[in-house]
Amino acid sequence: MRTLKSLVIVSAALLPFSATAFAADAIQEQPPVPAPVEVAPQYSWAGGYTGLYLGYGWNKAKTSTVGSIKPDDWKAGAFAGWNFQQDQIVYGVEGDAGYSWAKKSKDGLEVKQGFEGSLRARVGYDLNPVMPYLTAGIAGSQIKLNNGLDDESKFRVGWTAGAGLEAKLTDNILGRVEYRYTQYGNKNYDLAGTTVRNKLDTQDIRVGIGYKF
């Protein structure tokens, strides 16, 4: 009887320690709560932007008197536009204005290009952080012919189309490379009583840097 009583007393004394150990084991066995994952905000191409470009043009001027002349040279200017975005489709309007130093002579006839600009639609596909795009619209340029006796300068209107790749360098800085084909059609020039018919096509590669608002 005394032995049974001693066992009861010892068991009662150990009970708090057993409960504490069980509780500690239960706490340790609970899986850790995962930390919340912060999702970075999706970049949007929507909004206004502006920038500068530098390029090189390969031109072909067909004339009715001396045949083809190829006045190739550098060009530079500025561009600005506005994008809209729906899911991954990016679309908008863009304009550019610049100057071409293209000038070349053949058999006494010189063809010289000057101011040039365009107003175009643009549509691209968001592959964040890059966007391939297509563009097309109207174009204009000042083109001068000189045969040594007389010269005439005319502002020519035509069309332009091309494709490019734009890249997000930072949240606000954009980089791009673009190919453009432009055709200014046929125009007659009166040079000292001689009518010279001219057609000018240009192909150029441009690289640019822009700022997105």
From Swiss-Prot:
The text of the family note is: Belongs to the Omp25/RopB family.
- Organism domain of life: Bacteria
Spell out the subcellular localization from the entry: Cell outer membrane
Ribosomal protein in keyword set: no
Signal sequence coordinates: 1-23
- What InterPro entries does the record tag this protein with? OMP-like, OMP/PagP_b-brl, OMP_b-brl
Name recorded for this polypeptide: 25 kDa outer-membrane immunogenic protein
Keywords of the record, alphabetical order, are: Cell outer membrane, Membrane, Signal, Transmembrane, Transmembrane beta strand
Question: Does the record's keyword annotation contain Signal?
Answer: yes
Q: Which Gene3D superfamilies match?
A: 2.40.160.20
- Which Pfam families does the record associate with it? OMP_b-brl
Q: Got a GO cellular component term for this one?
A: cell outer membrane
